[in-house]
Amino acid sequence: MTFPRALTVIDDNGMVINIIFWFLLIIILILLSIALLNIIKLCMVCCNLGRTVIIVPAQHAYDAYKNFMRIKAYNPDGALLA
């Protein structure tokens, strides 16, 4: 099957269409890579936010609890016998 000659502007055996499709493919790949990088940045921001909002305050509360519950060791010389 041959392409009608009346619709042929330049007889380049599909080179122009091939170049257009390659440029479209490259543009789509660039857009997908930009979207992937933005998703990775979003994950990093969420991890940092979770660390700042949840983990660090819980760690400070646990450290305060440990300091509050610290009991001095038994010293038999310092004990008072009644």
Curated annotation (Swiss-Prot):
Virion surface side: 1-19
Keyword Protein biosynthesis included in the entry's annotation: no
Intravirion face of the membrane: 41-82
Subcellular location: Host Golgi apparatus membrane
Principal subcellular localisation of the protein: host cell
Keywords, in A-Z order: Apoptosis, Host Golgi apparatus, Host membrane, Membrane, Transmembrane, Transmembrane helix
InterPro entries: E_protein_aCoV, E_protein_CoV
HAMAP family documented for this protein: ALPHA_CORONA_E (MF_04205)
Protein name as it appears in the record: Envelope small membrane protein
Organism, as annotated: Porcine transmissible gastroenteritis coronavirus (strain Purdue) (TGEV)
